[in-house]
Design a protein with these regions (language model features):
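A glycine/threonine-rich phosphate-anchoring loop and its flanking beta-alpha core
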Residues: 11-109
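Generic hydrophobic alpha-helical membrane-span motif
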Residues: 5-6, 27, 62, 161-162
């Protein structure tokens, strides 16, 4: 993404970063690290905080609305990612000190998004503002503890596997939505509720909409545990203890 290139350059050259997002499909415009892909593996490098972050609603509304709605993918993922962190902690596998207050903060963000779901689907100023404010709230939770465990988990790992398998990019929030749909079911984590919320928001997460063939998705799911085990930097999730068949 352009914002990741900008963050990387700002970090390397020690320059001020001015961020003016044109779509809200991912939270990268609010986070300090640059997401760099190396052989389809994602690495987060450096630190460049937007100074200032400029939100122009006219610019955002000029984009296809589905690209802004996609922004809720990295917020709805709190539902599955927080479950994964709680699960990992219960198994003594959490990579970080467990923070109940971080989990509770994530739940408040989800409630805020649920309360603004109609505006988000309408792509109006209140809906756009809700996504931006939720991203900022997420940062206030995650940056002090130096990780995004409440927002990234098994739902993101399916995306990583599919991206490596198919060797093509996706609209981030949409593919994360697919991960939420499937992994919330593996978790037995209120899947009908989170699916209803995604549907009400207008998030486009269906495989056919991303040209993901059934066989590719099935093979990705069957390979998911092996894929996760092969990546040293991926956190412990429900995938590690599940047999998908």
């Amino acid at each position: 993404m352009a914002i990741d290139v900008a963050k990387y350059i700002a970090w390397k050259l020690n320059k001020r970063l001015v961020s003016i997002p044109t779509i809200l499909s991912v939270d990268a415009f609010t986070t300090p690290a640059a997401g760099i892909r190396n052989n389809h593996d994602v690495e987060y490098l450096g630190e460049a905080t937007p100074d200032p972050l400029i939100i122009d609603y006219n610019v955002l509304r000029s984009a296809p609305k589905e690209l802004n709605i996609a922004g809720v993918g990295d917020l709805f993922s709190i539902h599955t990612a927080s479950f994964d962190w709680e699960y990992a902690n219960s198994r003594g596998k959490s990579e970080y000190p467990f923070k109940v207050e971080a989990i509770n903060g994530g739940k408040k963000i989800l409630e805020f998004i649920y309360d603004n779901i109609g505006n988000i689907k309408a792509n109006n100023n209140n809906g756009l503002r809700a996504i931006v404010e939720a991203y900022i709230s997420l940062n206030t939770i995650c940056l002090p503890i130096d990780h995004f465990r409440i927002e990234e988990g098994s739902e993101h790992y399916l995306f990583y596997e599919l991206e490596e398998r198919l060797k093509r990019p996706f609209i981030h929030g949409n593919i994360i939505g697919l991960g939420i749909y499937l992994l919330s079911r593996l978790q037995n984590n209120d899947p009908l509720f989170i699916t209803e919320m995604m549907n009400e928001s207008g998030l486009i997460y269906q495989p056919i909409s991303m040209n993901i063939k059934k066989d590719d998705l099935v093979n990705s799911l069957l390979n998911l545990k092996k894929f996760v085990k092969s990546k040293d930097k991926l956190w412990y999730t429900i995938i590690d203890d599940s047999e998908i068949n």
